[in-house]
Amino acid sequence: MPNLKAIRDRIQSVKNTKKITEAMRLVAAAKVRRAQEQVISTRPFADALANVLFNLLNRLKFGDVSLPLLQQRDVKTVGIVVVSGDRGLCGGYNSYVIRRAEQRIKELKEQGVNYRLVTIGRKATQYFSRREAPIESKYTGLNQIPTADEAATIADELLSLFLSETVDRVELIYTRFVSLISSRPVVQTLAPLTMQGLETEDDEIFRLITREGKLQVERETVTQTMSSFPQDMIFEQDPVQILDALLPLYINNQLLRALQEAAASELAARMTAMSNASDNAGQLIGTLTLSYNKARQAAITQQLMEVVAGANAL
């Protein structure tokens, strides 16, 4: 016969665990909203910057501009930036982005191209360190909601690696936020920039909304139209110098947005994982309660039978 006290203790333990997972779900949901607000707040600057770059490149003719960040080189070494989380309890978030990085590394090896890693997040750092991969830099302990200063620090090092020709291309592997239950690891080239890299048409931003008491994601398609500069506009500085100053800002902004999307993906994955854990805990509590009631009923029945048997013996 099952031990009633053991079942009762286990029920209480699962209830306590459910309280923790539910609290973690609510915290993650609140932080997803903050990540969303940050993405939206940085959008006007990104739009204005893209518009200026678009017009400058059109005015100067892209192919005629000789700037380091626009120069295509023979690719011998690729710098791969892998963005992961610092903690677990977020489903397959970390394993998916690491798997995508491994896949990209395999592709480069098959092409005879070397690679150098820049890891962001403790999980990616630990994974590749254990495998003695060539890690150029490691970044851990960043804010859960990435800041512009953090992105600028990382972007400066990436630009240094590219401009010093330590690497011939910089690729960013991060998790793009799709929905609360879906995310997708993607590969984006940060440097060198191409004309396609400045296109923002049909870009999307996400909004976390509450509908009928449930959290949902609403994606908004950005249909930005680039406004052209007047043909007789006179630049106080050389347009090439302006472009040279703005390109690092653009890369910095792209990195910041990728970090924000990755953070939102991690928080959404954690929220989903904790929601599933809470649901599973509720089901387990129901199963244990049923087992407890059956065991208690069996114990009472056994006691009654013993009393009746004793009375008959008299």
From Swiss-Prot:
Q: Write down the InterPro entries for this protein, in alphabetical order.
A: ATP_synth_F1_ATPase_gsu (IPR035968), ATP_synth_F1_gsu (IPR000131)
- Tell me what this protein is called: ATP synthase gamma chain
| Entry keywords, A to Z | ATP synthesis, CF(1), Hydrogen ion transport, Ion transport, Membrane, Thylakoid, Transport
Q: How does it assemble?
A: F-type ATPases have 2 components, CF(1) - the catalytic core - and CF(0) - the membrane proton channel. CF(1) has five subunits: alpha(3), beta(3), gamma(1), delta(1), epsilon(1). CF(0) has three main subunits: a, b and c.
NCBIfam families cross-referenced by the UniProt entry: ATPsyn_F1gamma, PRK05621.1-2
Please name the GO terms that the record assigns under molecular function.
ATP binding; proton-transporting ATP synthase activity, rotational mechanism
Instruction: Note the topology in the membrane.
Output: Peripheral membrane protein
| UniProt record similarity statement | Belongs to the ATPase gamma chain family.
Subcellular location(s): the record lists:
Cellular thylakoid membrane
Q: Which domain of life is it from?
A: Bacteria
This chain's source organism reads Crocosphaera subtropica (strain ATCC 51142 / BH68) (Cyanothece sp. (strain ATCC 51142))
Q: Which HAMAP family match?
A: ATP_synth_gamma_bact
Q: What is its main location?
A: membrane
Covalent S-S links between cysteines: none
**Gene encoding this polypeptide?**
atpG
Q: Name one Pfam family in it.
A: ATP-synt
> What is the stated purpose of this protein?
Produces ATP from ADP in the presence of a proton gradient across the membrane. The gamma chain is believed to be important in regulating ATPase activity and the flow of protons through the CF(0) complex.
Q: Which GO terms describe its cellular component?
A: plasma membrane-derived thylakoid membrane; proton-transporting ATP synthase complex
